[in-house]
């Protein structure tokens, strides 16, 4: 049985880890980095770049370089959060036929799971290169506050990448696993404050040890799936744009190239200000107008940055208060605070968290790697390699159905431990009603329309009866991934209807299968592209070598002998510019065949060989000697 890898599919960066013996290990990617930027680029040559290579070319290809796709996954195009991103992202966000938020690339619409699958494929390949064997199974993490549609979309991304997703686990829970696995005995209640690139979560987790078995029980969770480092970056970018407009009278928001340069510079400045008090944002030739080129040079202090983002940090503390109240705990009952996510490196975040909890956060957890490590531990648990660890997670949002008057009736309260199952009996609203529509909702509001609609289905064939008489039993079943299954049964006729919630949007199985086939086709195309590049390199090498020999010994050949060689060189050069690998290989062989006389001319002549042999005798000790240490006996 192969290894089950752990993947932290992040908004800004992703990370992969695996159990190496009895210890989790973060795996370096092909570039030698322990984290990979969650950036995907589609080039003019139809090549797909992922990670650092995609990030490097973003400035010259802003419309086809996609980042922060996790903020769109499982969302509707009309969602308020998506509409905010539409106006600031350099790439195109479009409405899919089913109303989901998709991305437009080179005139084609692409689903977020399809794009995220490219990052997962990179993580899969990174693990395979390290392990030296195929990887087909993974535990993938999601923000604790992800709803059902977002969890389903993440699982879809795994399928498209060729991975069987053995478990979806919440990021703060994974971080708690990473933190608590090697800690000493005793019970602890910890708060995991997870502020990543695009999402924020706060989970209260109790770690108990009984008879050598560690139990990680999530008491409550809360968060904001549209609050993270990207929002901090956007505050910096908007400040720089506004300052530049004041100074130069030019609005850079209409220039995608300039905005991409500003995004990189803004992120860099934000990171620098975690250790420095001041930084210079210097972007020469950022744009030009009738008066000539314009340069951006703006000083940014830590104090200014903090004033720009202070409300975002304060906003993160609201879910903290709710999670504590839901767990029935006070701040003083929290033993340790764990910071996860790159944005928690900001001093202001650390100060606010310390002030709120009245204790300094732990520094012994790597905020970029803890989540992937925890996912790898859970993979080890599922594979049977890690014993004595029990994980009890919760559903982040209440679940229910719409009942008469447009009210949401809750069946499963938020923060219920999963897996779980709950049934409740409902009835008809009208006399002789023969069918009921079960409208499944997720959220905390009383009015049905104010909650997230997860889908609906009909139960038909109800026997005619006065209103309130038929008994319709509705059952909610949430599995360990947090995925919801709903059934409705008429107790009078025993007729039953079941569905696994596929959000009223989301990808169909056919669409996912097509994307899997596309991904496999792309893998074949990538292999062919690699072979073509190798053939071109061989051709270039041969052309260069032949030209060099022609310049050195070409005068020893007749014009009749040289002409076919020069023609074969020209033919090979022309073929190497094309896309036909077989044609290049044919021309390579043709050049090798006509170059025989040139090779002979390049061989040392007998007299030269004799001279070389003579000189070789006198230098035999130099050529053949082995180095050995000579000790000086004085």
Swiss-Prot record:
Pfam families: HSP70 (PF00012). Residues 599-634 are annotated as: Disordered. InterPro entries: ATPase_NBD, Chaperone_DnaK, Heat_shock_70_CS, HSP70_C_sf, HSP70_peptide-bd_sf, Hsp_70_fam. One of its GO terms (molecular function) is ATP-dependent protein folding chaperone. Gene3D superfamilies: 1.20.1270.10, 3.30.420.40, Actin, Chain A, domain 4, Substrate Binding Domain Of DNAk, Chain A, domain 1. The modification Phosphothreonine is found at residue 199. The keyword Acyltransferase does not apply. Residues 600-614 have a biased composition (Low complexity). Keywords: ATP-binding, Chaperone, Nucleotide-binding, Phosphoprotein, Stress response. The keyword Zinc-finger does not apply. Induction: By stress conditions e.g. heat shock. Acts as a chaperone. Belongs to the heat shock protein 70 family. PANTHER family: HEAT SHOCK PROTEIN 70KDA. This is Chaperone protein DnaK. It comes from Pasteurella multocida (strain Pm70). The gene is dnaK.
């Amino acid at each position: 049985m192969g290894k089950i890898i752990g993947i932290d599919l992040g908004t800004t960066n992703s990370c992969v880890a695996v159990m190496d013996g009895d210890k989790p290990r973060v795996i370096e990617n092909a570039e030698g980095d322990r984290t990979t930027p969650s950036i995907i680029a589609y080039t003019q040559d139809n090549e797909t770049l992922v990670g650092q290579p995609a990030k490097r070319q973003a400035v010259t290809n802003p419309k086809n370089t996609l980042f922060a796709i996790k903020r769109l996954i499982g969302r509707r195009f009309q969602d308020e959060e998506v509409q905010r991103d539409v106006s600031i992202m350099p790439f195109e966000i479009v409405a899919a036929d089913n109303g989901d938020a998709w991305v437009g690339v080179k005139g084609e619409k692409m689903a977020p799971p399809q794009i995220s699958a490219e990052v997962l494929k990179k993580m899969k390949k990174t693990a395979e290169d390290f392990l030296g064997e195929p990887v087909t199974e993974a535990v993938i993490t999601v923000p604790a506050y992800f709803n059902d549609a977002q969890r389903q979309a993440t699982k879809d991304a795994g399928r498209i990448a060729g991975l069987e997703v053995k478990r979806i686990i919440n990021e703060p829970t994974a971080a708690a696993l990473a933190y608590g696995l090697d800690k000493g005995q005793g019970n602890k209640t910890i708060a995991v404050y997870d502020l990543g690139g695009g999402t924020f979560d706060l989970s209260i987790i109790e770690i108990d040890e009984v008879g050598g078995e560690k139990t990680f029980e999530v008491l409550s969770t809360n968060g904001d799936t549209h609050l993270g480092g990207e929002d901090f970056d956007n505050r910096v970018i908007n400040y720089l744009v506004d300052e530049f407009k004041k100074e130069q009278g030019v609005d850079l928001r209409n220039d995608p190239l300039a905005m991409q340069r500003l995004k990189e510079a803004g992120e860099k400045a934000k990171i620098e200000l975690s250790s420095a008090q001041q930084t210079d944002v210097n972007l020469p030739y950022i744009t030009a107008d009738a008066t000539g080129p314009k340069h951006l040079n703006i000083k940014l202090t830590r104090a200014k940055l903090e004033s720009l983002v202070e409300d975002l940090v304060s906003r993160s503390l609201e879910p903290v208060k709710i999670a504590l109240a839901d767990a029935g705990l006070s701040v003083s009952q929290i033993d340790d605070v764990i910071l996860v996510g790159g944005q928690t490196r900001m001093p202001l975040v650390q100060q606010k968290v310390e002030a709120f909890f009245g204790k300094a956060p732990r520094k012994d957890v790597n905020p970029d790697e803890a989540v992937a490590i925890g996912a790898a531990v859970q993979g080890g648990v599922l594979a049977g390699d890690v014993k004595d660890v029990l994980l009890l997670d919760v559903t982040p949002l209440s679940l229910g159905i719409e009942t008469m008057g447009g009210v949401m009736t809750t069946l499963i309260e938020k923060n219920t431990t999963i897996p779980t199952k709950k049934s409740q009996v409902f009835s008809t609203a009208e006399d002789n009603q023969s069918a009921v529509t079960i409208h499944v909702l997720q959220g905390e509001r009383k009015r049905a329309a104010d909650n997230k609609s997860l889908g609906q289905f009909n139960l038909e064939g109800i026997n005619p009866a006065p209103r309130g008489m038929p008994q319709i039993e509705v059952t909610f079943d949430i599995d360990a991934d947090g995925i919801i299954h709903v059934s409705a049964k008429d107790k009078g006729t025993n007729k039953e209807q079941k569905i696994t919630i596929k959000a009223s949007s989301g990808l169909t199985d056919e669409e996912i299968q097509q994307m899997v086939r596309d991904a496999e086709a792309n893998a074949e195309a990538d292999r062919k592209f690699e072979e073509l590049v190798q053939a071109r390199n061989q051709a270039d090498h041969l052309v260069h070598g032949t030209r060099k020999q022609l310049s050195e010994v070409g005068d020893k050949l007749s014009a009749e002998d040289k002409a076919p060689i020069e023609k074969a060189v020209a033919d090979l050069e022309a073929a190497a510019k094309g896309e036909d690998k077989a044609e290049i290989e044919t021309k390579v062989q043709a050049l090798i065949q006509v170059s025989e006389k040139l090779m002979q001319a390049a061989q040392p002549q007998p007299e030269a060989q004799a001279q070389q042999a003579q000189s070789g005798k006198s230098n035999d000790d130099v050529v053949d000697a082995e180095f050995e240490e000579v000790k000086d006996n004085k």
